[in-house]
Amino acid sequence: MSRVISRSTPGGTCIVSKDDFLKSFEEVPKMEISSPSDFKEKLDQTIETLSKGQEDWNKRMNKLKQIRSMVVHGEDVIGREQLLSQLVRLTDCLDLSVKDLRSQILREAAITCGFLFKRFGTDVRQIAERCLPSAFAQVAVSTKVMATCGAVLTLFIVEFIQTKQIFTCIASYSTSKDKNQRRQLCALLEIVLEHWNEKIKRTVLPQIGELIKAAICDADPETRVAGRKAFSKLDALHSTEADKLFASVDSSKQKMLRASDAASSSTSINSERGTAPFRSKLSAGSIGGIRNAPNISSKFLAQRSASAIDTKQVTRMATSVSRTPNIRPMTTRTLSKIDTSPGGSKFARPTVGALGSRTSSNLRARGSVPTSQPGSRNGSPPRRPSATEAFPAEMQRVKSNLGSNSFVSSLSAEEATKLQKAMNTAKESLRQPSRNDDDEFLLPKRPTPQKATPQKSALDTSRVEEVIRACSSTSANEKREGIKMLAGIVSEPNLSNAEIKSLGAVLNRLLGESTNQIVLESISSFVKTHHPRLSDWLKLGLGKLFAKKGAEMTLNSKKQISTTISCILSSFDPTLQLKSTCELVCDPIHLMSPKSRVVLLEYLNELLGKYMERGSSFNTKEMKATILKMFSWMADQRNEQLITPHGEKVLCSLFALNNADFSALFNDFNPDYRDWAYKVLQSHGHDQHVPQQDAVSEEACVRATISTTAAQIEDFVVSRNLDMTPVKSPSTRAISSGFKRVDAEPLRPLSSEMNSQHRDEELSFNESFDRLKLNSTTHLIDDTSEQSKYVASKLAQISGDMGAQQYEGLLSIQTMLCEGSFTLWEQNFAKLLIAVFDVLSKSESDANKKVALRVLTKMCTSQASRLFDSTEMAICKVLDAAVNSQDGTMNVTADDCLKTLATHLPLAKVVNISQLILNEEKAQEPKASLVLKMMTRLFEGLQADELSPVVDDLAPCVIKSYDSPSSAVRKTAVYCLVAMVNKLGMKTMEPHLQNLSSGKLNLVQVYVNRAMSSSSHSHV
């Protein structure tokens, strides 16, 4: 068996081969194993020694040999199953030994691992999966013995451990910076193709094709050679995949692959003089003709180098002799089935006079024959003729032109003269011989698999790859040129799905870097041409556009982005756009800035109002979550004025689109959200300006739409108040709606389909609106005595045992807090806080607890300083209420309350209670998740200078939570770490993140990068 060489060196000094491994497998000292306990004791000693990296290398090397001896002599004693369970314990120490930089340790570790893999196969896959990256790392080492040890170990792993994880690991090295690792990957792909189970191999064949393609296109020539060898193996075992790969590369690579098919142990024909491989190098048409050609000597072909053969002479002569049409091109494998007898035996001996009549008309020989490569027979001195070999002048000229006398010697003087004339004619017609034609003549032709769709040329494919590469370049000039070419590429209709995905990623990246008009125009062209295949891209593309428009300051740039957004609105299916927008709103990774949220709401409003058909259904879980998220945006006091008007417009658009779905959707919400919704609808109906009678009226359809929408709003408002007792307030004022019907008559409520079974008579709009004012407490602001009595009565209700009265009292207090009519804080704050805490602790009603949480939130925003001393208790009460609740929506209310508490109360106290909860030995998973979410909101809501002093206290707790067995806790821990990095920067967080494993750290980095690209407020 040939040795595995990791890099090009003269000779094979200091190189370890697979044979060396096999010889060493059982060359170990004999060891007595008396019992399973004896085996375990010896294994413990071995593990102890191998786990010490600083231990004497000779001891460690002997222990590695001892492992093989224990397996050989102990398997029969303790049994295979028990042996395997013990061997798994070696995983860490074997991996450490494979990583060792001493060649003696590495060699023995590699031999031991190879021995285990060959003997036990996938039963020890855990060891193989751990050691494979370490073995690959050794392949890149400059020391030959270490590099080849690592390379041979990878061969054993891939041959005997046939798992998807192993393939995924080796595939990752296709982009390695080290050429030796990329070259080794090709050797491993050959093993996968040859040895792996068909069932497993079938699932990874497309990936194998991509890896071989990458190797064929590699910058390193030796890697390209290895890639061509892997392609030959793929062609031999899976011709369909090979044909697909062949069709996907450009013409130069196709030619290279055909040359690889045709190549033998030597590149020139004279090294395979007159043997079958030469025929396999010819196209099928050439073989058919040359086989019967009467005037071509086998010695002529055998004695000339490949570059000296005049291919046109041979093919045309063969064509003229056989007079048969060309056969369809066949693959190399098909050609190899043709008779493989020695090459010269199939050519008939030249017949006198047979050539002369055809040569002058059909033969097109070259006037001059290219010189052979250095070292070929053409460069050697010509043999001196004997005295008996006297040639006429014509024969000498033919001899000098053809460079060989074996073919010419069989011709008569007359034939030689005619041949010379034909060659002179060819010299005039073929002034510039093409070496490419020579190459093509010698290369087998592959059939291109037929496809239903037009096949794009390899030139187009390479052009797309070139543009993508240029747009990703760090060179400003190269990127600029790539962006210019991008505009023409994206509108091509025959792009593959992979190219569309790559182009979409490039456009998103360019959009995140700067506002470039060419990029925006390219996105518009991209969307117009390929929108049926861009459903996966839509969400990310919209997120980028919203973030970019929200961050943009110049009016001109905003207009350009708006044009691109309008193109998306008009191109994609509205239902798909609504779904993608809802997913974007609810995605916790896309941390949109307030201005970006405004852009999103504007887009959503336009989508609902102009592009979706009236009556379209939207009662989905995604839409419900979107509305809840929108409410949370509107409730944020810092951005309330910016976002609320746009959120209210979206609510009205939803109602106008399908009022039945709107009502059904809000029936699932808690009463507060329902109240908020109909108040929004009511306020928008009331605030519309009344058109003057003498003003120019709108078109009839527009007026009808306004009238219908107004009537629907009335119906919704009235239906929401049917359960309220119609008690007239003396202070009630008659307020008429601002909406007018087409006939300018006052609005009257239409019969509501939703509640027709509950209504016996129509209620006027004024009466229904009056009912909204019944619970108003604004009149108590100035009347302190009345307010004191009112608050005392409500506190008594809250403290009572009746659930309904408790709920009513909490709602009344909440109304006062919302309207700002609760002014007697000095007298009532402590009483109200105790009452709220009692509800959170003792109430059995989840609805009461949710209202109590909202009251606590309002108390914190209004009188945060009064709550300072009760910070820890407040947070604990909220957490207990959420954890003990069976209501799925309780966590949403608790999240909002905790966010308010964390951002308004003393930071030190919030950090202290968070540490205590997260550091509990058996922390409750729901409670830990809520605390981590609270900390995430904390880092999103406060300034970096406030948070820097506490990061050293909080970060270890979050890192610890990342190791939780609960996936929900791990997920929230990742979001919290991302928020920390975004706010404080990677440099500040790096000391803490070093405690994470590489996989976890990579995951955090991925989310950080996503957050950076989508948020204009990133601090990283």
Curated annotation (Swiss-Prot):
GO molecular function, one term: microtubule binding
Pfam families reported for this sequence: CLASP_N (PF12348)
Entry GO terms, CC: basal cortex; centrosome; cytoplasm; cytoplasmic microtubule; kinetochore; microtubule organizing center; mitotic spindle; nucleus
Positions of transmembrane segments: none
Sequence ranges of the HEAT repeats: 954-992
Keyword Cell cycle: yes
Keywords from the named record: Cell cycle, Cell division, Centromere, Chromosome, Cytoplasm, Cytoskeleton, Kinetochore, Meiosis, Microtubule, Mitosis
Compositionally biased residues, Low complexity: 259-271, 372-381
SMART domains: TOG
Composition bias type Polar residues, residue spans: 329-343, 450-460
Subcellular location: Cytoplasm, Cytoskeleton; Cytoplasm, Cytoskeleton, Microtubule organizing center, Centrosome; Chromosome, Centromere, Kinetochore; Cytoplasm, Cytoskeleton, Spindle
UniProt-listed GO biological process terms: astral microtubule organization; attachment of meiotic spindle microtubules to kinetochore; cytoplasmic streaming; establishment of mitotic spindle localization; meiotic chromosome separation; meiotic spindle midzone assembly; meiotic spindle organization; microtubule polymerization
Region (Disordered): 259-280, 329-387, 419-461
SUPFAM superfamilies: ARM repeat (SSF48371)
Protein purpose: Probable microtubule plus-end tracking protein that promotes the stabilization of dynamic microtubules. Required for the formation of mitotic and meiotic spindles. Specifically promotes the polymerization of kinetochore-bound microtubules. Also required for cytoplasmic streaming. Essential for embryonic development.
Family annotation (PANTHER family): CLASP (PTHR21567), CLIP-ASSOCIATING PROTEIN (PTHR21567:SF9)
Protein family per UniProt: Belongs to the CLASP family.
Subunit structure: Interacts with hcp-1 and hcp-2.
Name of protein: Protein CLASP-2
Source organism of this protein record: Caenorhabditis elegans
